[in-house]
Swiss-Prot record:
Ligase is among the record's keywords: no
Active site residues per record: E254, C288
Pathway per the UniProt entry: Amino-acid degradation; L-arginine degradation via AST pathway; L-glutamate and succinate from L-arginine: step 4/5
Chemical reaction(s) catalysed: N-succinyl-L-glutamate 5-semialdehyde + NAD(+) + H2O = N-succinyl-L-glutamate + NADH + 2 H(+)
Protein's organism: Shewanella denitrificans (strain OS217 / ATCC BAA-1090 / DSM 15013)
Alphabetized UniProt keyword annotations: Arginine metabolism, NAD, Oxidoreductase
Entry similarity comment: Belongs to the aldehyde dehydrogenase family. AstD subfamily.
InterPro entries: Ald_DH/histidinol_DH (IPR016161), Ald_DH_C (IPR016163), Ald_DH_CS_CYS (IPR016160), Ald_DH_CS_GLU (IPR029510), Ald_DH_N (IPR016162), Aldehyde_DH_dom (IPR015590), SuccinylGlu_semiald_DH_AstD (IPR017649)
Enzyme nomenclature, EC number: 1.2.1.71
Binding-site positions, NAD(+): G231, S232, S233, N234, T235, G236
PROSITE patterns per the UniProt record, alphabetical: ALDEHYDE_DEHYDR_CYS (PS00070), ALDEHYDE_DEHYDR_GLU (PS00687)
Entry protein name: N-succinylglutamate 5-semialdehyde dehydrogenase 1
Amino acid sequence: MNQLEQLTPLTQTQFIAGQWLAGKGPSFSSVNPANGEVIWQGLGADAGQVDAAITSARAAFYTWSAMSLTERLVIVEAFAEQLKEHAELFARTIALETGKALWESRTEVGAMTGKIAISIKANAERTGTVENPMPGAKAFIRHKPHGVVAVFGPYNFPGHLPNGHIVPALIAGNTVLFKPSELTPKVAELTMQLWQQAGLPNGVLNLLQGEIATGKALASHKGIDGLFFTGSSNTGHLLHQQYAGQPGKILALEMGGNNPLIITEVANVDAAVHDIIQSAFISSGQRCTCARRLFIPKTANGDAILAKLLTSTAKIALGDPFAETQPFFGAMISDKAAAGMVKAQADIQAAGGVSLIELTQVTPGLGFVTPGIIDVTDASPLADEEHFGPLLKVYRYTDFDAAIDEANNTSFGLSAGLLADSETDYQHFYRRIRAGIVNWNKPITGASSAAPFGGIGASGNHRASAYYAADYCAYPVSSVEAQAVSLPASLSPGLVIE
């Protein structure tokens, strides 16, 4: 069987103990949000299959964790080579299933391979062995894998974000149960096929496809030692409550944000507008780091920036992800998501928000929406929630500190940014803003994989899916070791050995 034949569509939806199996749970499907075509159908995993996958992962753990790091890295690097070899297929699969423009889908695959190299480096630098001499012995700090861990992936980056958990978990010696979003099963299936071709031993990575019932069966199973989650704040909070009484399980959460972007004085109006658009509307606004709230001063410079933002936003090209002339963004993940953004806008309008550019669902039943900008300066207080799409709320302000206070008026704390020519303004902003990612004169959707990624408050509890992922994929073990037992030269007071 050649490689292309191995990558043909499957009728089996689950990968358990090295075997492709049909699911035994409810049927579900994946729909291309750009044209409404059903591109994948299958049965989800039931509770029995979840149990079987965990049993398989537990059995594989002892062999996998006993392998040398070098041996594990050979397989991880082989997966990276598979990604490079099938990069275009992977990118087209992402675009087909998510509606994301092909140019951006290609960057996602590139980020996946880059993340592998960073994960290898992070494991060496953050979880290596430290040896210190002491009288009559040696003291060691080593790291051990947790065991069997679950990875829950999101739909917005269905390859890159699960990859950011799976790769460091495997490098550390864990075995993994991968539960992807039910909206992107086709990308998950391809991911698993490439791991299979890379030579991953049976049971080390198991794929469990399905909807809510599958996820609940996995998250609540006593046989897992931890769960790594990227997704909505609501689901993450439910997981946090569920795991509150289980201190023995590691829980890493990377969730959303109600992210602020503040402007003070910027001479380069065009560049400021570019960074605002990149912050708010990239990926149809479906990035957890996207700007949701824009603070613009009531100044002539602020007026100029807002005016150009409106004219430039109105010209944003959206369309078919595979169009020869590529759009800035394609469709949202689903018709439901698109309709949800229309409703969110209506709710804000009802609270007194004034639409400067109306967000519209282009075609009923599909995921295309035009970007929207709504002035909420004089609106009633709004709910602190993440609107996961291309809708930007504008606040006009006269006092910088008051703008920062309002930017911090959220339970979230993922990303924040300042566009300002003044470094003094930035230092003032940096000291006061609450966020795990803080940028100056750069889009707030930009983050380095070589740095921590994540937030505070309702945005998460670990720096997931980046350099610091090595920290939650293994735990430190302190040891004092000697070649033989020995009697000390002097005994403690009151102690006699005879």
